[in-house]
């Protein structure tokens, strides 16, 4: 991992000729580069690559030297690791970071010592993020008074309050002290903001709105680059920011090429022209693998993962808009049998959709086998069958005008979110931790780490009873089912209940990410990034558009960092 991007030329521009560059449809929204400008950007990537590689290698060498010096300073090494994570360059230092945090964990239960609020909260958060279980009560109880309340003098420590709020996001179930810590820190940070300068207010507000653990790190790198420009007291920060700028631009170039390749695949597939009722947004769908699988060296894996993600959206639209109950039943049977001949009685658009699904899945299984010496076809087929069976169940409900019980709806809707299907593909494409135990968990159970992400996605989607762009179908929502189960419940109360469920599910997800864990650290990070991506994908405006997602696409793909 430390050398994941030592040869960026192996990722950028070697898979698709310039003549095949096509213009992403999503990226012509207001404020996006024009189609010609986008083509010029991709051309420029290749022209500037050699110089960027040289500068990046030099910056990485200097950053490693800075890390080796600062790691010996126990007053700074946690601050340094936090900076690396926020600047998006921590993947270069994974082994070194693990060594530092293991040392911190081993001594955390040593003789009782007084710590500053910010130090204690930062250590707790970094260890929890790394999978270590640190009892919250052991860390934060000493910050309370005799009445069991957080000490009032802590309210004067703005930095400490920010770290305390960040730490509270790592809470697990029945950890009341972290719930109290989150409420306490949020209250006083909000009290402070009217009295701070503009720059400080932006930092505090950003912490409250986008706590690090629940936010895609890559989407906030630019904010932290700006922030650290104001924090010059640690000279190693400047070294890290120089690397972060080069790293951001280099990975941006990789992602532009990946989206171009997926667009070419989608256009050549031809399904969009045959299924005009379905969504046609491959560039939007690409964002799932781009933010989930963050290791720059896993470029082909992201490209392949975008294919089943696209097919999930397409097949979802077929079940919502593109077939009769009998046709959908036959389609589901074909997926369960996994036979081309089973589609003979289906309409043409369903035949070609199944053929695309069949071919893509078999191709991915073959590539996984070549790379990791394991053939996952059984697991992939089973995941698709499970998804389509759930789609069919929902289609039958709504064709009959039936509104199921809330729990019954959610159990099925968690599957139709597509999260399990996508994360099964992610697991095998990444190839880390393929064991009998993990395979059995994926095939026969619904691992909590996956079902938690699926629950968060489904509830976020249903929170606004959101309709996706250009989609006219109706498939109910948890809120409607809940209000039917509990007559007299207002929409506001139902929404508050869903918000509470999302918060509780995040606690479950945090629990499932702690060690010991049968899944690899890289897969755990991918699942967490899926949960972090959800608010961007489902934050619809009144016109059923996604302005925040579009702004993130613009920032991540087309707005480079000045060096």
From Swiss-Prot:
Binding, Mg(2+) 2: 316, 320
Kindly report, in one word, the top-level EC class recorded for this enzyme: lyase
Q: Which GO terms describe its molecular function?
A: magnesium ion binding; terpene synthase activity
Q: What GO biological process terms are annotated to this protein in UniProt?
A: diterpenoid biosynthetic process; hydrocarbon biosynthetic process
Keyword Transmembrane helix applies: no
Would the keyword Magnesium turn up in this protein's UniProt record?
A: yes
Could you say which EC number(s) this protein's record lists?
A: 4.2.3.-
Look up the record and name the cofactor or cofactors this protein needs: Mg(2+)
Q: Where does Mg(2+) 3 bind?
A: 469
Q: What binding details are noted for the cofactor?
A: Binds 3 Mg(2+) ions per subunit.
Q: Could you tell me the keywords of this UniProt record?
A: Lyase, Magnesium, Metal-binding
Query: Which Pfam families does this one have?
Result: Terpene_synth (PF01397), Terpene_synth_C (PF03936)
Annotated residues that bind Mg(2+) 1 are located at 316, 320
Q: Where is this motif: DDXXD motif?
A: 316-320
Q: Which InterPro entries match?
A: Isoprenoid_synthase_dom_sf, Terpene_cyclase-like_1_C, Terpene_cyclase_plant_C1, Terpene_synth_N, Terpene_synth_N_sf, Terpene_synthase-like, Terpene_synthase_metal-bd, Terpenoid_cyclase/PrenylTrfase
Report the protein's function: Probable sesquiterpene synthase.
| Family, per entry | Belongs to the terpene synthase family.
Q: What else is known?
A: Does not produce any detectable product when tested in vitro.
Q: What remark about domains does the record contain?
A: The Asp-Asp-Xaa-Xaa-Asp/Glu (DDXXD/E) motif is important for the catalytic activity, presumably through binding to Mg(2+).
Name under which the protein is recorded:
Probable terpene synthase 4
